[in-house]
Amino acid sequence: MENIFFSKLTQVFIVALLCIFIYRTESAMSSHREQLSLTGRRMMANIPYPYGGIYVKPPPLKSKDSNQKGKRGETYYKPNSEIGTGPSHSGHGGSSIEHVSSP
């Protein structure tokens, strides 16, 4: 009788450990999937629009003449992209120094 009790207790213990293991694995996998999703979005952001990126339709242009039809360019949103800026032509800021005054 004592042998049956320990056998049942062992089975309950194994089932409890199995449930804990499955629960911990599911919680770990869901965060892992989220991380993969973020990594995938970052990778897709570096690919040009037809193959990646997010297409953004420009807002309609409001003009005074309603009969005027202008062609709007299509754009796409590329998250975390760098904005290309050239040197300043106004002399305020920019990366190059054109005039150096001597003391």
Curated annotation (Swiss-Prot):
User: What residue range is the signal peptide?
Assistant: 1-25
Task: Mark out the compositionally biased spans (Low complexity).
Answer: 84-103
- GO molecular function terms attached to this record: LRR domain binding; receptor serine/threonine kinase binding
Task of the protein: Brassicaceae-specific phytocytokine (plant endogenous peptide released into the apoplast) perceived by MIK2 in a BAK1/SERK3 and SERK4 coreceptors-dependent manner, that modulates various physiological and antimicrobial processes including growth prevention and reactive oxygen species (ROS) response regulation.
Q: Where does it reside?
A: Cell membrane; Secreted, Extracellular space, Apoplast
Motif SCOOP motif extends across 82-96
Q: Output this protein's name.
A: Serine rich endogenous peptide 9
Oligomer and partners:
Interacts with MIK2 (via extracellular leucine-rich repeat domain); this interaction triggers the formation of complex between MIK2 and the BAK1/SERK3 and SERK4 coreceptors, and subsequent BAK1 activation by phosphorylation.
User: Where along the sequence does the record place the motif called SxS motif essential for MIK2 binding?
Assistant: 88-90
Q: Where is the composition biased (Basic and acidic residues)?
A: 62-75
Q: Which GO terms describe its cellular component?
A: apoplast; plasma membrane
Provide the family line. Answer: Belongs to the serine rich endogenous peptide (SCOOP) phytocytokine family.
Keyword Secreted (UniProt): yes
Q: Which UniProt keywords apply?
A: Apoplast, Cell membrane, Cleavage on pair of basic residues, Membrane, Secreted, Signal
As recorded in Swiss-Prot or TrEMBL, the protein's gene is named PROSCOOP9
Query: Please, which domain of life does this record's source organism belong to?
Result: Eukaryota
Tissue specificity of this protein: Mostly expressed in seedlings shoots and roots, and, to a lower extent, in leaves, but barely in flowers.
Q: Where is this region: Disordered?
A: 54-103
